Amino acid sequence: MLIVVSPAKTLDYESPLVTSRFTQPELLDHSAELIGRARQLSPDQIASLMKISDKLAGLNAARFADWQPDFSPANARQALLAFKGDVYTGLAVEDFSEADLDFAQAHLRMLSGLYGVLRPLDLMMPYRLEMGIRLDNGRGKDLYQFWGDIITAHLNKALAAQGDEVLINLASDEYFKSVRPKALQGRIITPVFKDEKNGQFKIISFYAKKARGMMARHIIKHRLTKVEQLTGFNADGYYFVAEESDANTLMFKRAEN
């Protein structure tokens, strides 16, 4: 079973590390090519392209300028420990043991606009380059064309390494669009999380993101390897709804308090 999640815009390079172990990202040649393109952008162009403030644009222009592929713990941090968004609040890696990290390293992948695919212990320098931005490059008009089949091929390699064919999609639509389902040598299962609001169940982005992280944590902490085991997920009041699930979708709901 392979789990994919989205990265986060918010980064943390300050908190204490839960491990000193690290690995190197496997697609850095592609990252370096993208950095070369990103360095051609002025801070004003970055602000416009990413729809961010001038201050953030300046920070990210500096990050592009400072980036170099020789990662070490002195200039980079393990991806699972560097991302700090809603998904990662749900993952709550602060209490992960080395055994948890071993399982995560084998079964969890983070999709990334700059790095393509990251394993939990892969070092990464700070960046902001969302998969959905329309950055034209030497391979096409956006990052989906840049990555092409590369991300899917990399996930196929990970699935083959564990002798499995189940991919659990806990990523956002923006990021999962970088995966080509027809080329994926596996079955895609997508958990969906709905919260009750004013008597109706709907996907509420903030809660859904956190729930995706909690599901990833549940799989890692309990060493789950079969799809049917996921139906037991009940963190924070979510419950499995069999009649609204099918072969490709697992529906979870949470009632209003």
Curated annotation (Swiss-Prot):
Signal peptide: none
A GO cellular component entry from the record: cytosol
Annotated transmembrane regions: none
GO biological process, one term: response to hydroperoxide
Domain of life (superkingdom): Bacteria
HAMAP family attached to this UniProt entry: UPF0246
Cited NCBIfam families: PRK02101.1-1 (NF002541), PRK02101.1-3 (NF002542)
PANTHER family found in the cross-reference section: PEROXIDE STRESS RESISTANCE PROTEIN YAAA (PTHR30283:SF4), PEROXIDE STRESS RESPONSE PROTEIN YAAA (PTHR30283)
Family: Belongs to the UPF0246 family.
Name of this protein: UPF0246 protein AHA_3667
Originating species: Aeromonas hydrophila subsp. hydrophila (strain ATCC 7966 / DSM 30187 / BCRC 13018 / CCUG 14551 / JCM 1027 / KCTC 2358 / NCIMB 9240 / NCTC 8049)
